[in-house]
Swiss-Prot record:
Protein's name according to its UniProt entry: Gonadotropin-releasing hormone receptor
Entry comment describing in which tissues the protein is expressed: Pituitary gland.
Membrane-crossing segments per the record: 39-58, 78-97, 116-137, 165-184, 212-231, 281-299, 306-325
Alphabetized Pfam families for the sequence: 7tm_1
Function recorded in the entry: Receptor for gonadotropin releasing hormone (GnRH) that mediates the action of GnRH to stimulate the secretion of the gonadotropic hormones luteinizing hormone (LH) and follicle-stimulating hormone (FSH). This receptor mediates its action by association with G-proteins that activate a phosphatidylinositol-calcium second messenger system.
MF (Gene Ontology): gonadotropin-releasing hormone receptor activity
Residues of the signal peptide: none
Ranges in the topological domain labelled Cytoplasmic: 59-77, 138-164, 232-280, 326-327
Cellular component aspect of the GO annotation: plasma membrane
Matching PROSITE patterns: G_PROTEIN_RECEP_F1_1, G_PROTEIN_RECEP_F1_2
Species lineage: Eukaryota, Metazoa, Chordata, Craniata, Vertebrata
Cysteine-cysteine disulfides: C114-C195
Protein's membrane topology: Multi-pass membrane protein
Localization terms from the record: Cell membrane
Length: 327
């Protein structure tokens, strides 16, 4: 997202904004060289992620057509289909929005699209994070409680539906907190317009609570669930192998079950690793900014852009991971 003009939240400023009165500010943001590089990389990753995820969906569709009529997709492929759709949604919404916003620097699309696109952006970020949680839970249950999973055919669909519903609901506040502000640049009648959350919260701690809630739902909670599920899978596989050492011969055809479980473990670990590597720099920078807004003046702009670009790698890596392990 383009760097916004810095504003201190005080009653006078908020009153001015609520009455659409321009505010006189200092130097306004412009598109710099590092910003142009960020835009170029963003659109390159957009093309890459779109191609990868669309290709996987196409392969999945062709694979489905070759199956016998009436035979359903496996649980894992259904989950991967929804994760791919979520990643594709994030790719088609977040990346073009970020790229275009950095090009224009300010917001020209009006308050309605300011609210709607901000909502869609967060919704498309929640969806893949929650779908990763569903996959981790499902794989953990499939290995630790296989009979319970097989006897409850609706469990998977219920978790998938819940992930989409929570994504829709949790992104809802974006429609309220985002709004337009208009600033005069101090050198004439030129007006700078931006889509921001400034003055949307009565108290500073309200915004802090919302930021940490979003951070927790997008990163901390999914990460903890993935780690716990992976630990349970490792523990279960280790216990099975200790009970029957012959199952260590995973390359033999008669040991398809433990080999499939090992593949499941590798895939879930790869998902968790990709999630951590891609999103940690993004959230480290975000948390730093929440506690110290002046950090943007101390951290070089190229480093700032570089950290944010890491998040766009995740929807590119995911189709490579599940394509390698599932097809």
């Amino acid at each position: 997202m383009a760097n916004n003009a810095s504003l201190e939240q005080d009653p006078n400023h908020c009153s001015a904004i609520n009455n659409s009165i321009p505010l006189i500010q200092g130097k306004l943001p412009t598109l710099t060289v590092s910003g142009k590089i960020r835009v170029t990389v963003t659109f390159f990753l957009f093309l890459l992620s779109t191609a990868f995820n669309a290709s996987f969906l196409l392969k999945l569709q062709k694979w489905t057509q070759k199956r016998k009529k009436g035979k359903k997709l496996s649980r894992m492929k259904v989950l991967l289909k929804h994760l791919t759709l979520a990643n594709l949604l994030e790719t088609l919404i977040v990346m073009p929005l970020d790229g275009m916003w950095n090009i224009t620097v300010q917001w020209y699309a009006g308050e309605f699209l300011c609210k709607v696109l901000s909502y869609l952006k967060l919704f498309s970020m929640y969806a893949p994070a929650f779908m990763m949680v569903v996959i981790s839970l499902d794989r953990s249950l499939a290995i630790t409680q296989p009979l319970a999973v097989q006897s409850n055919s609706k469990l998977e669909q219920s978790m998938i539906s819940l992930a989409w519903i929570l994504s829709i609901v949790f992104a809802g506040p974006q429609l309220y907190i985002f709004r337009m502000i208009y600033l005069a640049d101090g050198s004439g009648p030129t007006v700078f317009s931006q889509c921001v959350t400034h003055c949307s919260f009565p108290q500073w701690w309200h915004q802090a609570f919302y930021n940490f809630f979003t951070f927790g739902c997008l990163f901390i909670i999914p990460l903890l669930i993935m780690l716990i599920c992976n630990a349970k899978i490792i523990f279960a596989l280790t216990r099975v192998l200790h009970q029957d050492p012959r199952k260590l011969q995973l390359n033999q055809s008669k040991n398809n079950i433990p080999r499939a479980r090992l593949r499941t473990l590798k895939m879930t670990v790869a998902f968790a690793t990709s999630f951590v590597v891609c999103w940690t720099p993004y959230y480290v920078l975000g948390i730093w900014y929440w506690f110290d807004p002046e950090m943007l003046n101390r951290v070089s702009e190229p480093v700032n852009h570089f950290f944010f670009l890491f998040a766009f790698l995740n929807p590119c890596f995911d189709p490579l991971i599940y394509g390698y392990f599932s097809l």
